[in-house]
Regions:
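Amphipathic alpha-helical dimerization/coiled-coil segments
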Residues: 2-4, 33, 88-116
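N-terminal helix-turn-helix DNA-binding core of bacterial DNA-binding proteins
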Residues: 10-56, 76-77, 83, 91, ...
Length: 116
């Protein structure tokens, strides 16, 4: 059973469960953040998400697409081009993540975990 199939059958105690499932792990929030303002190609995402491997980026993009947070559009041209863009669900999630990112910066500075 695929990970996204398991998510659909889980019993959640509150809305944080499905939200954390959607952005769980090290990379998904960073990928969504990269797509906030405009669609991006695979290479742009790879460069924009520091430290992610090609294999992991492919896996995370597939999961985000399966969870209906982004779309993958293949342009039939030479050379082939593929773009990733946020769906309405993905855009709404990014709006929800913005205050969390603000809190994270304040928290990290206040606890000495942020160099900036």
């Amino acid at each position: 059973m695929a990970a996204s199939s398991r998510k659909k059958t889980r019993d959640y105690q509150c809305g944080l469960g499905p939200a954390f499932d959607a952005v769980g792990g090290k990379w998904k929030a960073a990928i969504l953040w990269q797509l906030m303002h405009k669609p991006a190609r695979f290479g742009e995402l790879k460069r924009g998400v520091a430290g992610i491997t090609e294999k992991m980026l492919i896996q995370q993009l597939r999961e985000l697409e399966s969870d209906q947070l982004l779309t993958r559009t293949v342009f039939h041209e030479v050379p082939p081009r593929v773009e990733y863009a946020l769906t309405e669900w993905g855009k709404a999630l990014n709006k929800a993540l913005a205050p969390l990112a603000d809190w994270g910066e304040v928290y990290a500075r206040g606890t000495g975990r942020y160099p900036g």
